[in-house]
């Protein structure tokens, strides 16, 4: 993020990586690293990250991604069983000065939100990453907890993740009434079977914004990337 005449610029990526399992059924962390690096994002919110699970070769995907991409990082284990973990991660070019994990429940698997405060020069920005449940009944219980967390965030803040809902869902309309959705320039699904379910929102007035889907076969989701510009005094 650069400051010129009090205008900041940040590129954000959100990506459900499905533990690196591509559309060809193969799990490959190397090509996932290449996919993320190609976006040249300042901040990356990841969902579906494995740590030490057999299905992904017992790799610590979180640590490997952070190391190979040379980014600051934090992790929230939505599922935590012995040494096996699965959850959300935030990667950042900027130092992470604090983080908070909130568990929001789930009938099939537990879900979480991961909030990180990033230090950018003398300023800071909050990023919240989440992955909501697949079924409507799950999300109806999770969304009020998420709303409570969002209401406590100061400006400027960004929320990104896999919401498992398109924008016409009543629950998403609630969020869109309070936060600004960064609309996709190339309208297309972010997951072929479910539609546009991966989103990026902000709570500050934006000078300029654009978002797009990056074509990819590295996961069953596509990366969503947003370019944001806002004024420091907002």
Please tell me what each predicted stretch does.
Residues 49:
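Short strand-turn motif at the edge of the Rossmann-like AdoMet-binding core
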Residues 53-59:
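Short, flexible/disordered intra-domain loops and linkers
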Residues 59-62, 169:
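Short, surface-exposed alpha-helical segments at coil->helix boundaries
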Residues 1-43, 52, 67-68, 72-75, ...:
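Active-site regions of metal-assisted phosphoester/phosphodiester hydrolases
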């Amino acid at each position: 993020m650069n400051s010129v005449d009090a205008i900041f610029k940040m590129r954000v990526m959100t990506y459900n990586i499905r533990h690196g399992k591509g559309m060809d059924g193969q799990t490959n962390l190397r090509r996932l690293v290449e996919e993320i690096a190609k976006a040249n994002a300042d901040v990356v919110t990841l969902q579906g990250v494995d740590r030490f699970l057999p299905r992904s070769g017992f790799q610590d995907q979180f640590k490997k991604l952070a190391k190979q991409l040379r980014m600051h990082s934090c992790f929230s284990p939505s599922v935590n069983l012995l040494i096996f973990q699965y959850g959300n991660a935030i990667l950042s070019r900027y130092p992470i000065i604090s983080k908070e994990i909130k568990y929001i429940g789930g009938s099939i698997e537990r879900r979480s939100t991961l909030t990180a405060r990033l230090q950018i020069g003398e300023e800071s920005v909050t990023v919240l990453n989440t992955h909501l449940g697949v079924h409507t009944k799950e999300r109806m219980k999770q969304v009020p907890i998420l709303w409570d967390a969002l209401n406590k965030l100061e400006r400027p803040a960004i929320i990104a993740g896999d919401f498992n809902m398109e924008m016409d869902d009543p629950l998403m309309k609630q969020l869109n009434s309070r936060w600004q959705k960064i609309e996709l320039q190339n309208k297309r699904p972010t997951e072929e079977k479910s539609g546009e379910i991966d989103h990026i929102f902000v709570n500050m007035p934006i000078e300029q914004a654009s978002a797009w889907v990056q074509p990819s076969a590295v996961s069953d989701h596509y990366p969503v990337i947003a370019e944001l510009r806002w004024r420091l005094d907002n």
